[in-house]
Amino acid sequence: MIVERIWTGNAYRNFNYLIACPETGEALAIDPLDHEKTLATARVKGWQITQVLNTHEHHDHTGGNAAVIAATGAKLIAHHKAGGRIAGVDRGVKAGDVIKVGKTVELECLDTPGHTMCHICLRSHTEQPALFSGDTLFNAGAGNVHNGGDVNALYATFAEQLARLPDDTLVYPGHDYIENNLRFTLAREPDNAAAKALLPSVTDHDPAKSAVTTLKDEKEFNTFLRLSSPSVIARLRESFPDLPDEPDARTVFAKLRELRNQW
C-alpha cells in the first residue's frame, strides 16, 4: 500500500489522500477537495484513480468529487446513510465492509459517528495498520459536533473503537490542526511532557512535511485520549466547579469538547 498525503494549503487546512496499489497503479482518492492537486499527483505517479471515498458529507470533503469523477470515471463510496447528503454515491458502506484497491490493498470501513452521523474511517489491513480518520480524530484533537454531530456519539467512537486500535496504527487525519491542538493540550494539562516536546517542531511548520503520528503518540498528547489524567481533571474542575469528584470519562470528554469549541 502506498499512501500519498496531499496538503491543500487552503483556509480549512485540509489533507487529501491517495492510496495506491503498487502492483496495478490503481488508486483510491479520499476526500479530494483539491481536485487539481489530486489529479496532478496521480498523473505524476502514473496512477489511475478508480474510486473516490468521502469520509463524511461536509463540502470541504466532497467539493472535489465531481471534477475527479469526470476526469477519471471513478466510482464514489460513502457511508450507507449518506446518499441523501452526498450526490452520486455508487456504493454505500457499513461497518466491516472492505474496500479493495487493485490487487494488494484492503481497507476496512469503520462506522464512526460523532462529527456527523454519517462518518466513516478506514483502517488498512497492513502489517503496520493505518487509520484514515477524516474529521473524527485529529493529531492531538477530536472533531467538533457543530454541523450534524453528537458529542456522546463521538465519545463512544473514541472509547469503543479508536482507543482500542493497535498502538502502532498510523494516523492520517482530514485536517492539519496539530499546533493549535497541542496548545489546547497544554492549556488543559500543562505538565504534558510529550506535548511540550512536540510543539516547537510544529509551530509555523509546513504541513506538507509534517510527521505522521501513531495512536501511541496520540495517547501521550491528545487530551481526548487522556480522560483519566488527574491533571486534565483538576484543570477541568477550574472551568466546571460542579464536576463530580470522580467524573466518568464521557463527562470529561464532553466538557473538553465544550472548552475546545471556544478555543
From Swiss-Prot:
Q: Does the keyword Zinc apply?
A: yes
Which pathway does it serve?
Secondary metabolite metabolism; methylglyoxal degradation; (R)-lactate from methylglyoxal: step 2/2
* InterPro entries attached to this UniProt entry: Clx_II_MBL (IPR035680), HAGH_C (IPR032282), Hydroxyacylglutathione_Hdrlase (IPR017782), Metallo-B-lactamas (IPR001279), RibonucZ/Hydroxyglut_hydro (IPR036866)
Annotated Zn(2+) 1 binding sites: H56, H58, H115, D135
- Catalytic reactions on record: an S-(2-hydroxyacyl)glutathione + H2O = a 2-hydroxy carboxylate + glutathione + H(+)
Q: What is its EC number?
A: 3.1.2.6
Q: What is this protein called?
A: Hydroxyacylglutathione hydrolase
- Write down the species: Polaromonas sp. (strain JS666 / ATCC BAA-500)
Taxonomic lineage is: Bacteria, Pseudomonadati, Pseudomonadota, Betaproteobacteria, Burkholderiales
